[in-house]
Amino acid sequence: MLQRCGRRLLLALVGALLACLLVLTADPPPTPMPAERGRRALRSLAGSSGGAPASGSRAAVDPGVLTREVHSLSEYFSLLTRARRDADPPPGVASRQGDGHPRPPAEVLSPRDVFIAVKTTRKFHRARLDLLFETWISRHKEMTFIFTDGEDEALAKLTGNVVLTNCSSAHSRQALSCKMAVEYDRFIESGKKWFCHVDDDNYVNLRALLRLLASYPHTQDVYIGKPSLDRPIQATERISEHKVRPVHFWFATGGAGFCISRGLALKMGPWASGGHFMSTAERIRLPDDCTIGYIVEALLGVPLIRSGLFHSHLENLQQVPTTELHEQVTLSYGMFENKRNAVHIKGPFSVEADPSRFRSVHCHLYPDTPWCPRSAIF
């Protein structure tokens, strides 16, 4: 019996020894190379099973990166850094917001970077323009250009930036589009960063305007203003002599003013430069501000950024809070529902002396103006 137990023990020891030898001589499992680790890491960033990254992920990797061959760990980190950099906006550039309110500055902007076009007609030179030159234009003559249809020596003495458009003085869509065409061409020639159009019944708060425009890079596609409708306008686009089709788009009303970046304005060239703006306006048979919206939204696919900081006489201006006047980009005056329509502000002037309230607003924004009463209470 002892001999039998001894043989069993010997066989067990021999078997264990053979098993150890087999384990030692077998090839070890390959250690993942840095490249493989890099690919696995990139796949994990992209999501499980090669799926798309989660919406809003700032570390999302370009699918093209995943198909590249990674030859070293340093290359992997290089690709990862590049992917994160590409996913983030450039320094100082925030993602576009739709509310049209100022955001952190995207670029440094000065008054000489902005081209303000004021559309008017000869019969309103005294009734409307004199008020503008007395108030906001007096501080910003170098950046403000008057587009009119009639010569005026008195106006020429006030500023050298008077542009005779050779357009009709009628308030027709053809005449309005004619003036807008001249405005566009003069802006392109100026080389300035921003084009802003206003009417001769608008007050422009330059500080608020610069603060708003500085929120957007002028090289990007930016069309900002305030629509007068609560829905896109429906129009008929004439494709050929006998063929039309429906088209709808948003547009910023010219009565409140609007601004366009140079980057977008250059893209508008095929439909706006030279005599093209007039022919484009005829395709939809709508006025100038509608034609701008048609080119930008319907043809170029750039959405209007709607801003509540622009105001026209088509809205109830009494609802603009006095405490927020310094934030508004444009104001207006006129009639609304058969009543006098202007912002509500106490100011140093009576409603009879200052029916538009522009003088009171100007003294509120620029109390150092020589003709503003020093003891004014707002």
UniProtKB/Swiss-Prot annotation:
GO molecular function: metal ion binding; O-fucosylpeptide 3-beta-N-acetylglucosaminyltransferase activity
Name this polypeptide is given: Beta-1,3-N-acetylglucosaminyltransferase lunatic fringe
Name of encoding gene: Lfng
Disulfide links within the chain: C167-C178, C196-C259, C363-C372
Keyword Metal-binding in annotation: yes
Enzyme class: transferase
Topology feature Cytoplasmic, residues: 1-8
Thermal activity characteristics from the UniProt entry: Optimum temperature is 37 degrees Celsius.
Region (Disordered): 85-108
Active site: D289
Post-translational modification: A soluble form may be derived from the membrane form by proteolytic processing.
Ranges in the topological domain labelled Lumenal: 30-378
Binding annotation for substrate: R128, D200
Catalytically driven reaction(s): 3-O-(alpha-L-fucosyl)-L-threonyl-[EGF-like domain protein] + UDP-N-acetyl-alpha-D-glucosamine = 3-O-(N-acetyl-beta-D-glucosaminyl-(1->3)-alpha-L-fucosyl)-L-threonyl-[EGF-like domain protein] + UDP + H(+); 3-O-(alpha-L-fucosyl)-L-seryl-[EGF-like domain protein] + UDP-N-acetyl-alpha-D-glucosamine = 3-O-(N-acetyl-beta-D-glucosaminyl-(1->3)-alpha-L-fucosyl)-L-seryl-[EGF-like domain protein] + UDP + H(+)
Residues the record marks as site: Cleavage: R85, D86
